[in-house]
Structures are given as structure tokens and as C-alpha cells.
């Protein structure tokens, strides 16, 4: 006979008797109890894992939300700094340099590349719209020529119809009234086309200013990273080199300009200045093309030759 101590267990199962059948029943009960305990442990682990995943998901969403807010606030700070710089001589803060070097890296490069691509796409669409407007004007001119010819034919008909009865005269007068109405419609269409031309010119001006500001910001980043500055187009969309001006790639290039060249640059960018200014003209031009690095802002300009 076996000792009951050999069948001690954590489930308070009674020990079997000396028969083999009773021992098998005891073993089956013990196995079911163990399986139930393991399932319960696995279920607890699964619930703990799900809670951990939910916590990580909430943490990640919170971090993303906070980062988006920070990026938005930082972008707003940059825009305000640029706006203040354009409205007056505001010293560009040094924390922008540190922030650009430590946080942005190549992000500005990619952003400006996408903005240039979007700007090129907008320019292509504007060019297509202008071509369509030109085509429409040509068709309008042809239609007006045809209308003039139709009027001449109407006058000839009226001369002949004067010999006919008065009833027929009334009908042709009605035709003339219709032609006058058509003329008025064409005049109205011409006015609308002229208005659209003015809007297109306004859009072109805004587009050029947008390109100018974009290139200015790009040069600020390139200057901080030690790269040569890219050419900043004038407000009319022309490149400075097309006007016979030397390119500006670094602050030393500005120092080598003559006063006439410096004035021509500032006028192209729409910058106001006093004719009596000398070195300040160079500083204005430096800030306008985006040479905002510490080395550029601390550079000592010389008088014009």
C-alpha cells in the first residue's frame, strides 16, 4: 500500500486507493487541473500584453500629437520672424541657427524641393491658362471681324429694303437690335477677359514673391551649413544674371559689388533705401538674399570703391 504523501498536490485532490484504475482517474484529474491553471496564466499574460500595447499606443499617439503641435508652433515662430524681418531691420535670433542645425538637418532641403516642384507646377498651369486666354482673344477678334462684315451686309440689305414696304423695315430693325445686343455681350466678354488678365498678373506677382521668399529661406539654411547661396529671382521673375549683374553666392560677393550694382539688386527685390546709404546698402542686400549665418552677419563690409 502506497503512502498518501506521495500524492500531495496543490488542488486538494484526494489520494487514490491501491487500485490501478483509481490511480488513472487521479492522474486525469491532476492533468486537467494543471491545464486549467496554465490556461489561466496564459490568459493573464495575454490581458497584460494587451494593456501594455494600449499604453504604448496611447503614448505614441500623444508623442505624435505633441510633436505636431511643436512643429506647428516652430513653423509659426519662423514665419513671424520672417514677417518682422521684412517689416523692419530685426536681428535674426541665434536660436534659429541652433535649432536649424540640431533639429532640421535636411528637412528644409526636402521641403524647399517640394515647394519648388509645386511652384513649377503652378507656373505651368498659369502658362496654360494664359495660352488659352490668348487663343480665346484671337477667336473673339475673328468673331468681331465677322460681325463687322455682317453689319455691312445688313446695311446693304437695309438700303434695298427701303424700297420695300414698311412692314419689312420693322423686321430688319429688329435684326439690328439683336446685333446690338450681341455687340454688348461681346463687349462684356472683353471686359471679363481684361479682368482675368489683371488677376493673372496679380497671381504672377504673388508667385514671384513666393519664389523669392522660398529661395531666401533656402539660402538661410544653406548658409548655416556652409553651402553657397542659390540665386534669388527678382519680383518680376527675372534672374539677376539676366540683367548683367554678378551672382551672389557668399557675403564676400556683396562686398565686391559697386554701388550701382547693389542699388540695382535692391530695386529688383523691391527694397526701400536711402540714396545716402553706403555700407547699409550691402547689409540690406545680405539680409534680402538670406545670408543669415553667424559668419555672414558678423562680416565687416567695406566702403564702395
Curated annotation (Swiss-Prot):
Residues 27-63, 120-207 form a coiled coil. The keyword Coiled coil applies. Belongs to the UPF0612 family. This is UPF0612 protein C337.02c. Signal peptide: none annotated. Keywords: Coiled coil. The keyword Lyase does not apply. It comes from Schizosaccharomyces pombe (strain 972 / ATCC 24843) (Fission yeast).
